[in-house]
Amino acid sequence: MGNSQTKEFRPPLSSSNRRSHQWGSSSSHGRSPYSDRHHAESSRSRGSRPDLSILGIGGSSERDVATLEHRRETKQEREARRLEKERAARVKERERSMREEHVDGGYLVTQGVYVGAEDFNKVVTRQLMIERRLAPFWRGLNDFSESWTEHQLMAAARGLPIPPPDEIPPELEYKNPPKLTEDGKESSIQHLMVPITSRSQSYGSEASQSSTPAHSLPTPVSPIASGTSTSPLFRSRAKTLASLTTSKLGSQIDSTPKEIHLPEDPFVNGQPIEAYLYKDATECPICFLYYPPYLNRTRCCDQPICSECFVQIKRPDPHPPEHGEAEPNATAAEGDRQDNQDCQLVSEPAACPFCVQPEFGVTYTPPPFRRGLVYATDPTLRPNFASPVSSTSSLASANAPPGTGRRRATSLSANDPTVITTDRVRPDWAQKLANARAHAARRSAAATALHTAAYLMNSTASGNESRNFGLGRRGVMRRTGQSETPSASSRSGSPALQALAFLTDRRTPGHETDSAEEGAGNLAPPRNSSRRNRIDDLEEMMMMEAIRLSLASEEERRKKAEKEARKEAKRREKESKKAEKAARKHGFYSNNASSSALDVPSDARLGRVTSSSSSITGEDASPSKGKEVDRASPSATAASSQSSTEIASDSMTINPHPNVVEHGSSAQSLMAQPSAREPPKPSHLRQVSSASSSFSSLVESTGEDHSGAYDGNASSTEPLFNFRSLAAVIGDEDKGDETAEHVEDTSSKPSAEGSASSAAPVADEMLGQSTAPADPIAVGTVAEERDCLMPKELETQSVEITSATRNTEATT
């Protein structure tokens, strides 16, 4: 709607767009590609307008890139660019000043002896030099000889190569100064005047008509007298108020004297000014350059020093007072305040580089002539305006003290009117000191607030008083104040407010007042304790924090040592357990299968059977055989034999058919069956493993395959079946042959033939055997009772039993 009409009927900004638009509209009523291009260009031109980019409506990408590049400029780059501009402007100003301005043959700008930053006040220095209270910047000579002629002195002063003494270059030739005529006097007077725009209308007439000092001085220009002739006599109220408000500024401007140029006269007493100045050159003891003898003199030791060295001497940077020294610039009214602020930064005045006396200052005795710039308000120069100083005139009798030629015997005070101190050319030292003090106060306040907030938060979070010993007496006072005023802690309970209260320390949080007048009255007076106490408290807190950290590190080291000791004890305990296990294993195999355990005499056939079983197996005893099986004491031998007898009778009674086991399963499967049952007690196992008797031997030969299915808990009827089965085995001799045939027949079975052995030997032979062959069965029984944890060992033991049975057959 309105926007589309604006697009259609807004005139383009450029003339080319206007021509294309007119041509396209006159050629055809329809839309043309030229008109489309015109609309696109006009929209782009409207989008790139700077007034729209301010509102954020549009803007070109090039301008955005330029803006980003401008924003990327860092502070250091801006400072470097500013310093470069200042240096270029200073070089240009130095060239102009050296070409156009001078004071008695010297200059108002430095000559490049020092290349550092010129941080002295150039306006004040220029004013002091024009007033002849400070020596100008003379051009220094690297070399000097008293035998130099006038043209050699001129060449050295102008920076030219020094010619031979008997040869005068053309540029150094000079003629005697001509005498001035009346026309020359008038022209010189006009030359000495200030420009007409900067002085009053009656200045020229006064200067030309009168030559007395009283009438020749310029009248000060006041704001009322500076009004135009067409202005009304009575001004409006607004102008009157404006003049009153600017009267102070106007008085300051009018108090500044006007600079005027004295007539150009390159000769003094018939000599060129350079030759007159440098004929008695003096060396500056600091920069070792030769200058005219009109140098500054120190007020204390009367040593010469050039102005370029003098303006480089300044106060040291603000620093804390050393050895309890007081503020040197403090007045008597600030004595009490200084006691309260004894740790503030101080700025010591510069000391003399020769005698190291403080309040360094210089005096200056100008030469007996005047050249170059002067101030028009100087009353001693006004009588000579009509008759300028000639080459033969001198001001020694008019305004310069007579030169006695000897040094001053006494030092001058720093407050002497003729003394110029270093603070005079650097009047901003007080502002620098105030800025440094404010910066140090901010840093100290920030550090104090951080420490206090950290301690307050730690004490609030922990809730114990052990961490609060680092707060010192200030923390004790704060805790006491908070305990006395519980309502104040509810109002200012946050650590930030407490830190702020600690920082100001004007009043405690409990002394807050609701009225603004009482609050302002409490904040106005400073606190009683000084800043030194605050610094001491801060140092105390920092020392306590260091002690706390040291104690924490010592505690951590002790805990680490205890942990290492515990680990070492555990390691030693493990090693002792391993050694004990190894000792028990070696003791088990050495005492196992021996007759000494049961005090039973051994037999030759028993040894033969044991050796044959060991040779059949073909391997040593495994380290895991009989693991964690304790040997029974000899006192428990009777109980062990009784238990083994019960187990043997039980196994023979429960499973009296060995053929079922022969054809049904292997010995390993029979060993695995008791795992589903509840194992007996370990003491019972130890008794079984250590038991060795004739009954267990008989059980080995007859009921090996039935041992896997016995029930250890069914021991109530064991004695009846035990003796009955034993009597049947011993009494029946006819079954011996059948049993031998049966064992011979089953020995060819692959898996169960070792387990299905019977009582082939004669009963008296079986009863006479020792209990040594019962040990492998006992070991197998132990492994069987421990839920078949080692099936390979059980299988090996079964093989040993089979071999023992075969050897028994062979013996029979």
UniProtKB/Swiss-Prot annotation:
<dbReference type="InterPro" id="IPR039301">
    <property type="entry name" value="Sip5/DA2"/>
</dbReference>
<feature type="compositionally biased region" description="Basic and acidic residues">
    <location>
        <begin position="172"/>
        <end position="187"/>
    </location>
</feature>
<feature type="compositionally biased region" description="Low complexity">
    <location>
        <begin position="200"/>
        <end position="211"/>
    </location>
</feature>
<keyword id="KW-0963">Cytoplasm</keyword>
<feature type="compositionally biased region" description="Basic and acidic residues">
    <location>
        <begin position="737"/>
        <end position="747"/>
    </location>
</feature>
<feature type="compositionally biased region" description="Basic and acidic residues">
    <location>
        <begin position="34"/>
        <end position="44"/>
    </location>
</feature>
<feature type="region of interest" description="Disordered">
    <location>
        <begin position="508"/>
        <end position="532"/>
    </location>
</feature>
<protein>
    <recommendedName>
        <fullName>Protein sip5</fullName>
    </recommendedName>
</protein>
<feature type="region of interest" description="Disordered">
    <location>
        <begin position="160"/>
        <end position="187"/>
    </location>
</feature>
<comment type="similarity">
    <text>Belongs to the SIP5 family.</text>
</comment>
<feature type="region of interest" description="Disordered">
    <location>
        <begin position="385"/>
        <end position="412"/>
    </location>
</feature>
<feature type="region of interest" description="Disordered">
    <location>
        <begin position="1"/>
        <end position="97"/>
    </location>
</feature>
<dbReference type="GO" id="GO:0005737">
    <property type="term" value="C:cytoplasm"/>
</dbReference>
<feature type="compositionally biased region" description="Low complexity">
    <location>
        <begin position="14"/>
        <end position="33"/>
    </location>
</feature>
<feature type="compositionally biased region" description="Basic and acidic residues">
    <location>
        <begin position="783"/>
        <end position="795"/>
    </location>
</feature>
<feature type="compositionally biased region" description="Low complexity">
    <location>
        <begin position="689"/>
        <end position="701"/>
    </location>
</feature>
<feature type="region of interest" description="Disordered">
    <location>
        <begin position="554"/>
        <end position="718"/>
    </location>
</feature>
<feature type="compositionally biased region" description="Basic and acidic residues">
    <location>
        <begin position="61"/>
        <end position="97"/>
    </location>
</feature>
<feature type="region of interest" description="Disordered">
    <location>
        <begin position="732"/>
        <end position="812"/>
    </location>
</feature>
<feature type="compositionally biased region" description="Low complexity">
    <location>
        <begin position="632"/>
        <end position="651"/>
    </location>
</feature>
<feature type="region of interest" description="Disordered">
    <location>
        <begin position="200"/>
        <end position="232"/>
    </location>
</feature>
<feature type="compositionally biased region" description="Basic and acidic residues">
    <location>
        <begin position="317"/>
        <end position="326"/>
    </location>
</feature>
<feature type="compositionally biased region" description="Polar residues">
    <location>
        <begin position="796"/>
        <end position="812"/>
    </location>
</feature>
<feature type="compositionally biased region" description="Basic and acidic residues">
    <location>
        <begin position="554"/>
        <end position="582"/>
    </location>
</feature>
<feature type="region of interest" description="Disordered">
    <location>
        <begin position="317"/>
        <end position="339"/>
    </location>
</feature>
<comment type="function">
    <text>May negatively regulate the snf1 kinase.</text>
</comment>
<feature type="compositionally biased region" description="Low complexity">
    <location>
        <begin position="386"/>
        <end position="402"/>
    </location>
</feature>
<feature type="compositionally biased region" description="Low complexity">
    <location>
        <begin position="748"/>
        <end position="763"/>
    </location>
</feature>
